[in-house]
UniProtKB/Swiss-Prot annotation:
The gene is yidC. Coiled coil: none annotated. It comes from Citrobacter koseri (strain ATCC BAA-895 / CDC 4225-83 / SGSC4696). The keyword Transmembrane applies. Pfam families: 60KD_IMP, YidC_periplas. The chain crosses the membrane at residues 6-26, 350-370, 424-444, 458-478, 499-519. Required for the insertion and/or proper folding and/or complex formation of integral membrane proteins into the membrane. Involved in integration of membrane proteins that insert both dependently and independently of the Sec translocase complex, as well as at least some lipoproteins. Aids folding of multispanning membrane proteins. The lineage of its organism: Bacteria, Pseudomonadati, Pseudomonadota, Gammaproteobacteria, Enterobacterales. Residues 28-54 are annotated as: Disordered. GO terms for biological process: protein insertion into membrane; protein transport. This is Membrane protein insertase YidC.
């Protein structure tokens, strides 16, 4: 095994990953256990069973803070629009990113209210409440840290229901507080609910470019319980009426897309029912309904929940609810990606530039991996030294494959050489590369993050393809500087085109990842020369490149 054959291993692992990525994007449904799912027979059945209403017509009011611009419908008090003024829709644009939307082309809403037997949002009790408000516009003023938006409705029996949105400066978590005044003679049985609903099909104006096979990220629903910290639920699964139905004490439900999320976090002490529903017309929903609370005659009951609507900022999300930060989807290598991001963020606190931070973390990672790299090159050098003996043995034994295998293993044992020693360190390094890929694709901090010169967004592909070409050049130099024992003509052709193949693949990769790979290759060249000098002193390497 030598350096150039290792490139074949890299290529195999890389192509396998890309094939898996594309297959996961289009074909692989999210499996669900029998304990947490049930199949429904009608599209509206699940929503109706939960006592959750449809949208209604009312007056639209505007609520603005320094980080949120919400539009709330007084019919039910649903959040129908959400703009994020500190996050532009596109690089260089003054138009804010829109998370929640209610248009003929696309529906994405955060619904909430009071259901249960006596809840005003229960469809069995008539139309949803039409709340009254004092103003049409609520703005967080300078010097003000908290904004309250009270909405009140009184039913025919004289019971008063107040729904108050509480927003704080610099925060994406919105508390929704309920007050129920029972003016009747019988207890009121009330449950809170929170529901997120969204069009399954993504129109062109909502496409962030993540449909690119190399930039694909998860878009769909998710939930968390004390037993299941983070579970995805695909829109396709909901569309097939394979719906979630699980009880949980604590937890949250969410809808996710690249860099941004919405989530409902119930704040009651009892049990909540988490569910998904196919609402028909191409709309999927995930939500919760709390267990009923009794409000006695003459008494006032208080309930609350929290809506997260904004970017996936891990520290802030973790402070809002346990495991909510896991919505920053780092894939199955999250246990590597998370500490890497914390290290990257720490480096950035000193440098102030994410691109230079990636360069520094590359040196750190490659420095930590240096012992494995040295072991890899040493093993390959020993294997090259054995090639004459192996070739002589093959000529002596002819077509006797069994004898060849036995004597070869005996030779490896006698010379204390592990034939897989060159591959194993390489395989160990591959998860680091993939973890960095997930980290760069999932961290909001790298969205629209500039580096230098023409690189204005490390999370996007290089617009001029300069970095991928430089990456291919560094691969070419590594290949030319590496000794080889490859004699098969087909393998030689593959090795010749390997830098070109990788360059083509990396054309669509985020600039930050390509930057990492370029720096990693440069470090490889430096480490390679240092290791070769040590091997020369031990008689295990020669500067003359052999091809036999």
């Amino acid at each position: 095994m030598d350096s150039q054959r290792n490139l074949l291993v890299i290529a195999l692992l890389f192509v396998s990953f890309m094939i898996w990525q594309a297959w996961e994007q289009d074909k692989n449904p999210q499996p669900q256990t029998q304990q947490t799912t049930q199949t429904t027979t009608t599209a509206a059945g699940s929503a109706a069973d939960q006592g959750v209403p449809a949208s209604g017509q009312g007056k639209l009011i505007t609520v603005k803070t320094d980080v949120l611009d919400l539009t709330i419908n007084t019919r039910g008090g649903d959040v129908e629009q959400a703009l994020l003024p500190t996050y532009p829709k596109e690089l260089g644009s003054k138009e804010p990113f829109q998370l929640l939307e209610t248009t003929p082309q696309f529906i994405y809403q955060a619904q909430s209210g009071l259901t249960g037997r006596d809840g005003p949002d229960n469809p069995a009790n008539g139309p949803r409440p039409l709340y009254s408000v004092d103003n049409d516009t609520f703005v967080l003023a300078d010097g003000q840290n908290e904004l309250h938006v009270p909405m009140t409705w009184t039913d025919a029996a004289g019971n008063t229901f107040t729904k108050t949105f509480v927003l704080k400066r610099g925060e994406y978590a919105v508390n929704v507080n309920y007050s129920v005044q029972n003016a009747g003679e019988k207890p009121l049985e009330i449950s809170t609910f929170g529901q997120l609903k969204q069009s399954i099909n993504l129109p062109s104006h909502r496409d962030t470019g993540s449909s690119n096979f190399a930039l694909h990220t998860f878009r769909g629903a998710a939930y968390s319980t004390p037993d299941e910290k983070y579970e995805k639920y695909k829109f396709d699964t909901i569309a097939d009426n394979e719906n979630l139905n699980v009880s949980s004490n604590g937890g949250w439900v969410a809808m996710l897309q690249q860099y941004f999320a919405t989530a409902w976090i119930p704040r009651n002490d009892g049990t909540n029912n988490f569910y998904t529903a196919n609402l028909g017309n191409g709309i999927a929903a995930i939500g919760y309904k709390s267990q009923p609370v009794l409000v006695q005659p003459g008494q006032t009951g208080a309930m609350t929940s929290t809506l997260w609507v904004g970017p996936e900022i891990q520290d802030k999300m973790a402070a809002v609810a346990p495991h909510l930060d896991l919505t920053v989807d780092y894939g199955w290598l999250w246990f590597i990606s998370q500490p890497l991001f914390k290290l990257l963020k720490w480096i950035h606190s000193f440098l102030g530039n994410w691109g230079f931070s990636i360069i520094v973390i590359t040196f750190i990672v490659r420095g930590i991996m240096y012992p494995l790299t040295k072991a890899q090159y040493t093993s390959m050098a020993k294997m090259r030294m054995l090639q004459p003996k192996i070739q002589a043995m093959r000529e002596r034994l002819g077509d006797d494959k069994q004898r060849q295998s036995q004597e070869m293993m005996a030779l490896y044992k006698a010379e204390k050489v592990n034939p897989l020693g060159g591959c194993f360190p390489l395989i160990i390094q591959m998860p680091i590369f993939l973890a960095l890929y997930y980290m760069l694709m999932g961290s909001i901090e790298l969205r629209h993050a500039p580096f230098a010169l023409w690189i204005h967004d490390l999370s996007a592909q290089d617009p001029y393809y300069i970095l991928p070409i430089l990456m291919g050049v560094t691969m070419f130099f590594i290949q030319k500087m590496s000794p080889t024992t490859v004699t098969d003509p087909m393998q030689q052709k593959i090795m010749t085109f390997m830098p070109v193949i990788f360059t083509v693949f990396f054309l669509w990769f985020p600039s930050g990842l390509v930057l990492y790979y370029i720096v990693s290759n440069l470090v490889t060249i430096i480490q390679q020369q240092l290791i070769y000098r040590g091997l020369e002193k031990r008689g295990l390497h020669s500067r003359e490149k052999k091809s036999s």
